[in-house]
Amino acid sequence: GYDRTHAPELRLGAERALLGLVVALFHDAGYIRQTDDTQHRNGAEFTRTHVSRGARFLERYMPTIGLANWVPVATQIIHFTGYEVPFGDIRLDDARDRRVGHLLGTADMMAQMSDRCYLEKCRDRLYPEFVLGGVALPVGANGDRAVKYASGLDLLRQTPQFMEDTIQKRLDGAFHGDYRYVEPLFDGRNPYIEAIDKSLSFLRQVLRSESW
């Protein structure tokens, strides 16, 4: 939808579209353990560093598919899907590359939150991953362990605020509402936002009634 609504000189073009697709497909590759890794038992242990690990994977992988020239861009824009690098510190020379990053980060969050099973995954899958990754019970500077998420249900209780912050600060904020570029493909509708709103409304209802 982006190229449909912009002048030729502003369009991303086929190569950048391919770049975005490749990074989208492998943006979570940093969760994968190396075959010789005897230190970690589960990929979830890489939660805090998986984006940087994914960037290193792209450094190795992209030259094997003829995209070596895009490695410097790919290893930067992958960080639009994570929290390891502040967006202002992501260095890109071409505004079109930054736009690809915004579209990538937008697609990542919208795909997650619009999933029909997103809420169940947060409770049943994401919480155990957060425990293994040190996110649920982070260790502070003084060495004490804090409780950020006490359980899967506690994670669900905090999910509405996360979703609202993501929409406000990421989708509408840092990414400038790029999710709207999908709307020309659906006659002005945005099924992803509709699904997110539906899940958020349902979750609030469940939290009020405590009918888990």
Q: Predicted segments — roles?
A:
Residues G1-R16, F26, G66, Y83-W212:
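Divalent metal-dependent phosphate-bond-processing catalytic cores, especially two-metal-ion Mg2+/Mn2+ enzymes
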